Amino acid sequence: MNIHEYQAKAVLQPFGVSLSKGVAILKASEAEAAAKQLPGPVWVVKSQIHAGGRGKGKFKEASAGSQGGVRLAKSIDEVKQFAQEMLGATLVTLQTGPAGKQVNRLYIEEGSAIDKEFYLSLLVDRATSRVSFVVSTEGGMNIEDVAHDTPEKIISFSVDPATGIMPHHGRIVAKTLGLTGELAKQAGKLTTQLYTAFVAKDMEMLEINPLVLTKDGELRCLDAKMSFDSNSLYRQPDVVALRDTTEEDAKEIEASKHELAYIALEGTIGCMVNGAGLAMATLDIIKLYGESPANFLDVGGGATEEKVTAAFKIITADPNVKGILVNIFGGIMKCDVIARGVIAAVKTVGLEVPLVVRLEGTNVEEGKAIIRDSGLNVLSADDLDDAAQKIVNAVKKAA
């Protein structure tokens, strides 16, 4: 689960992290009052969307102006102008894809006199099964370029969960950033604060980009990006309250209501599979034969007929779907249950695109009989390779 920048800063504040003052707004009419709560004479007007690269992004609408999603205002009138232009407009960044995201919230923040910009993040490192820090002197909007062109400028280290954060971790951060004396002490303190917040709130990722050194000698988190482990949300009700469903894919929201693992992709072949490994293999073989998957959808091992029907409805709700592949290996999940769910869904929502069903495992003959006797135009496949070729050929033929 992701949250907005202003929410992330509110999460960090109780842990003592040094932050700039700011006010979030939902309406352009609130911009003047928000700016007057901050000292000025410079304000930063920031688009709040669940995507990075806002500063380099561009708005689709000409009425939003030529500047990006993060703008520097030198007067309250300019704050008001930017708010009027940006709210309701569609911001396109490298992370949003060409469709972009509508800006429904802005964060108006006091300006900072910046001396240096750094990069600091924490993440759950699968390789070490620990929380790892990623640190670089090359902060700001171009960290992706740094990672690609000069990876030696990025330093990482992990924290042993048995000991937790220790003073030497702070010293590593300070040394990497070239900080000494009082600034090294600030770096050590910040390292502890961020790690404590990361663990306490069950985060998956915490990115501070940039972490700045102000001209008056203070380390300050100028931006904050946060994501949380969805499996831990039951014990983080304050985090759940921050969820903004307008930033999420409507199909993914519907899938979560039925406990379906669904991720929207950009292809044309909808997939319904049981088991994450088989689902990944299904996506791969679709690509192998020249098409792209429209989604990842794992119905799980104990899906009911109703759950399968819901999954099918979610897939068919995607206008980009030109064909559907159902690939089931029945273990706990029974093939006849899948078959009944698919037939029920087809009868409910209709079938306007090719459908290929591959069943194998528990009650496979019963499942195939249900599909065969349904009278519906469903193609049956004997194995995964056969299924992938049939759906790809059917989609190309229908195009």
From Swiss-Prot:
In its UniProt entry, what is this protein called? Succinate--CoA ligase [ADP-forming] subunit beta
Q: Which residues form the ATP-grasp domain?
A: 9-254
Superkingdom classification of source: Bacteria
Residues annotated to bind substrate: N274, G331, I332, M333
Which stretches are annotated as coiled coil?
none
Q: Where does Mg(2+) bind?
A: N209, D223
Q: Which gene encodes it?
A: sucC
Q: Which GO terms describe its biological process?
A: succinyl-CoA metabolic process; tricarboxylic acid cycle
Q: What does this protein do?
A: Succinyl-CoA synthetase functions in the citric acid cycle (TCA), coupling the hydrolysis of succinyl-CoA to the synthesis of either ATP or GTP and thus represents the only step of substrate-level phosphorylation in the TCA. The beta subunit provides nucleotide specificity of the enzyme and binds the substrate succinate, while the binding sites for coenzyme A and phosphate are found in the alpha subunit.
Species of provenance: Rhodopseudomonas palustris (strain BisA53)
The EC number of this protein is 6.2.1.5
**What's the top EC group for this one?**
ligase
- Which cofactor does the UniProt annotation name? Mg(2+)
Question: Entry's Pfam families?
Answer: ATP-grasp_2, Ligase_CoA
Is Metal-binding set as a keyword in this record?
A: yes
What's this protein's family per the entry? Belongs to the succinate/malate CoA ligase beta subunit family.
Involved pathway(s): Carbohydrate metabolism; tricarboxylic acid cycle; succinate from succinyl-CoA (ligase route): step 1/1
**Alphabetized GO MF terms:** ATP binding; magnesium ion binding; succinate-CoA ligase (ADP-forming) activity; succinate-CoA ligase (GDP-forming) activity
Q: How does it assemble?
A: Heterotetramer of two alpha and two beta subunits.
| SUPFAM superfamilies linked | Glutathione synthetase ATP-binding domain-like, Succinyl-CoA synthetase domains
Q: Which GO terms describe its cellular component?
A: cytosol; succinate-CoA ligase complex
Q: Which HAMAP family match?
A: Succ_CoA_beta
